[in-house]
């Protein structure tokens, strides 16, 4: 009798599990994400003179533009902006962060190098070597390599040259 009761209980549990679970469909788009990117390619010359050295800033920053969960989108963008530009920019929108970062990079370049360049130009030893040391370049390119319900892979390629012999390259 006991064996029959256990078998009947197992059969009842299996049947009820089958009937009640059929109405529970999984929403495969629960965390649907769409990505976009913002691109900047800006070249700024010292003193605004195209004959003088320049800095070149190239940005291609991917960010979450749409999501079924706004909090997910916001937290991803916070992380992306922090990883690309630093913690100072993580509370901004992607558009605002790119604009502020571009302004700061160009402003710092001109403020830091124009006085030194002017002094070197007055001392003028070798025109070509002076120009090479004052030419700067920075590139930050990010993109989403993989995005599914379990994994998001975000890659950032960073390179920078600030005069001298070698630049910096990281991924």
Where would I find each of the regions flagged by the language model?
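Active-site acidic/histidine clusters and adjacent loop/turn architecture
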Residues: 31-150
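Bacterial signal peptide processing site
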Residues: 23-26
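Short helix-loop boundary/capping segments
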Residues: 170-171
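Short, solvent-exposed beta-strand/turn "edge" segments of beta-rich domains on protein surfaces
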Residues: 145, 163-166
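Bacterial N-terminal signal peptides that target proteins for export
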Residues: 1-9
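C-terminal motif of bacterial Sec signal peptides marking the signal peptidase cleavage site
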Residues: 18-21
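Generic short beta-strand segments
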Residues: 155-161
């Amino acid at each position: 009798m006991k064996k029959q009761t256990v078998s009947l209980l197992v059969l009842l549990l299996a049947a009820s599990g089958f009937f009640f679970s059929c109405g529970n469909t999984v929403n495969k788009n629960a965390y649907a994400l769409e990505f976009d990117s913002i691109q900047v390619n800006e070249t700024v010359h010292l003193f605004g003179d195209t004959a003088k050295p320049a800095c070149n800033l190239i940005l291609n920053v991917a960010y979450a533009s749409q999501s079924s969960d706004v909090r997910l989108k916001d937290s991803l963008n916070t992380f992306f902006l922090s990883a690309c530009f630093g913690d100072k920019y993580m509370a901004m929108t992607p558009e605002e962060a790119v604009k502020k970062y571009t302004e700061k990079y160009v402003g710092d370049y001109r403020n830091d190098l124009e006085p030194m360049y002017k002094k070197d130009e007055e001392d003028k030893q070798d025109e070509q070597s002076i120009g090479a040391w004052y030419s700067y370049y920075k590139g930050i390119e990010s993109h989403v390599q993989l995005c599914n319900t379990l994994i998001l892979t975000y890659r950032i390629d960073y390179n920078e040259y600030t005069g001298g012999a070698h630049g910096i390259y990281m991924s």
